[in-house]
Amino acid sequence: TVLKELNSRTPLKDNSGNIVTPISWECSCMVRKCGACAMLINERPRLACSTFLHTLKGSTIILEPLSKFPLVRDLIIDRSILFENLKKLNLWLESEAYMNPWTHEPRYQSARCLMCGCCLEVCPNFSANGTFAGTVAAVNAFRILNEEQESTHLNEICLLYTSPSPRDTR
């Protein structure tokens, strides 16, 4: 995979043949479960742990950090905006949840979101400084709205998501 190759060559050299310091990147699970290794690989958002070199076209592989998030260093980005958006939108369970067996499959599919940011990288409406929280928030809202029982918190979330925004009233 791309992650296995990253920094495995010693010494690491740039295009001019100069020795460079190892590239900083994040990973945790190495098995497509955490999303920490999300990056642009040949200009496409992918998880580096599940991208195999033989599937990439061309003799050159270009690795870049996801561009919609603040850069920390090399291929490391700051995804904290994803968690801040969930806090701002009150997306958590506050009361006991009843799991309707008929909604198991959609809930399972929504729980597969790794919050890696790949979907937001290609979303024209998302920016780290913008008001649109993106798919990550929508997936979490779906889970909350389908699980939490009647409560003040649920009513507040429903009101938030069904009320027109100030932009919609123009």
Question: Could you tell me what each predicted segment is?
Answer:
Residues 1-160:
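Signature of N-terminal electron-transfer/Fe-S-associated modules in redox systems
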Residues 161-170:
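Single conserved hydrophobic/aromatic residue that forms the stacking wall/gate
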